[in-house]
């Protein structure tokens, strides 16, 4: 990472960003073509899970090259400067990772992967039918590397700051 001052090295902080993210963006490549797609996801601390329909473009890219790059972000906030157009920016925390995609094929694995996704969004495990598992393709990204970035430190508000009039 070029800006080491923005790098997040703590795995605990990186995991926290992943758990706070709403969307995972997957980047695929084949031949001389790239494909980026947002997906809902689950995370178990070592792998990311996502699902697809039985057919589609993602599957074509996975078949050609099962290596992926992925991105997640959390705590995104626009910081506007009403006097200087060149001083608008975003505060954010993000994670970029690389890994290898494999398909979960048994109903037990697929239900486990789908529950990782549901747990991410709902905080609980669900009863997922064998029929749902049979008609859904579920995938696991075995994470090989992760890097985190924080755009800037969010200012800490002290009691003295809070007492000052605007």
Model-derived features: where do they sit?
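Short Pro/Gly-enriched beta-strand edge/turn motifs at strand-loop
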Residues: 20-24, 121-124
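Short beta-strand segments
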Residues: 21-54
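A short mixed-secondary-structure module that forms the rim of ligand-binding clefts
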Residues: 42-78
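Extreme N-terminal tail/first-helix region
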Residues: 1-19
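Short, low-complexity, charge-dense intrinsically disordered segments
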Residues: 156-166
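A short, structured loop/turn motif at beta-sheet edges
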Residues: 62-64, 104-108, 163
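Charged, gly/pro-rich active-site loop segments
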Residues: 2-5, 75-155
